[in-house]
A protein has these predicted regions:
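Short, surface-exposed ligand-recognition loops at beta-strand->loop->(often short) alpha-helix junctions
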Residues: 10-21
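Intrinsically disordered, low-complexity acidic/polar segments
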Residues: 17-19, 61, 97-100
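Short coil/turn motifs at secondary-structure junctions
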Residues: 13-15, 45, 57-59
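Short hydrophobic/aromatic beta-strand micro-patches
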Residues: 9-11, 53-55
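Glycine-rich beta-strand-turn "strand-cap" elements at beta-sheet edges
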Residues: 1-4, 11, 39-48, 76-100
Length: 100
């Protein structure tokens, strides 16, 4: 079971909601290529609020992701796309339903 995760909340600038969604969709291939990233989800919470949730088997995978292409692109586009800085939290997973 993965024990490490990141939960991020992103608030799109007014009129940038579609661009944020497309940006997140464009990150999927990078997430797939990250060996240490077990799961990666991008989702919409509300009209202008988006989220990312990803999991890692170990600290090394988490750190590789935080220093990887998605994180770099996210912060490079932050001022253009987001109303406020992305809210990123490291999360400890202590229980989960196994994937079948």
């Amino acid at each position: 079971m993965d024990r490490f995760a990141i939960s991020a909340t992103l608030e799109a600038r007014p009129g940038k909601e579609s661009e944020v969604e497309e940006f997140l969709k464009s990150a999927q291939p990078s997430a797939i290529q990250e060996v240490g990233t077990t799961t990666w989800f991008a989702f919409r919470i509300g009209p202008a609020t988006f989220g990312i949730f990803d999991t890692f088997a170990n600290e090394a995978g988490l750190q590789a992701h935080l220093n990887g292409a998605i994180a770099k692109a996210l912060f490079a586009k932050a001022e253009e796309l987001f109303a406020k800085p992305p809210q990123i939290q490291q999360v400890e997973i202590f229980a989960a339903k196994p994937l079948s």
